[in-house]
Amino acid sequence: MSTSKRKRADEAQWNKRSTKKKGSAPQAKKPGGKGERPSLQIQTLLHSGDTMITVPSGGVCDLINTYARGSDEGNRHTSETLTYKVGVDYHFVADAASCKYSNRGTGVMWLVYDTTPGGNAPTTQDIFAYPSALKAWPTTWKVSRELCHRFVVKRRWLFTMETDGRIGSDTPPSNQSWPPCKRNVDFHKFTSGLGVRTQWKNVTDGGVGAIQRGALYLVIAPGNGITFTAHGQTRLYFKSVGNQ
């Protein structure tokens, strides 16, 4: 092949490459499409100082999806909400009464869904209907058969606390050392996929009396009589759905 023919062939290949159609610009996403999901709203419940949680023998049950009506991020904007995720970050401290004894106990934390709260928050006895002989051992508690259509345990977590007969301010003699025990416990959990749907009455507050259907409770019970206080926060991730 002559040099002129080779040159013409090379020029033809170059022209083909240079005339390729350029990629079209990415199309703008349509409003409300799959690419545009509204961000989850966040409500934070702080428990410290005067608002710390006191956990007595038999436990405590607190409403946590307390979304009052309003325009802020932590408020509900419609008559229906969906709670997707919950994060709990707490520091448990055995109280002075428990620290007088050497003891070890397994406590329990639950997230409990209440289909029809009826205007009043239940007690742990209402939910689990445990006999008085099992009050100090929450690991044995189960939702009663008669109320299983109303109360649904969404999550259940265990934790261990210990006491050694000394309070935190005690100091050992100079020639001794005391082994540590779990009188102070850090408790951190994050859970998703809850799908708790709450229907609200036509009121503005976020109490249990404002809920028509779908309350979510944080239930904590001490094990073997080691009562304590809880300091920290609960964070809920939710959406306002349905009609205004």
Swiss-Prot record:
Positions of transmembrane segments: none
GO MF annotation, one: structural molecule activity
Disordered: region residues: 1-39
Residues making up the signal peptide according to the UniProt record: none
Subcellular locations according to the entry: Virion; Host nucleus
Top-level lineage group: Viruses
Family, per entry: Belongs to the geminiviridae capsid protein family.
Entry protein name: Capsid protein
Naturally occurring in which organism (per UniProt): Maize streak virus genotype D (isolate Raw)
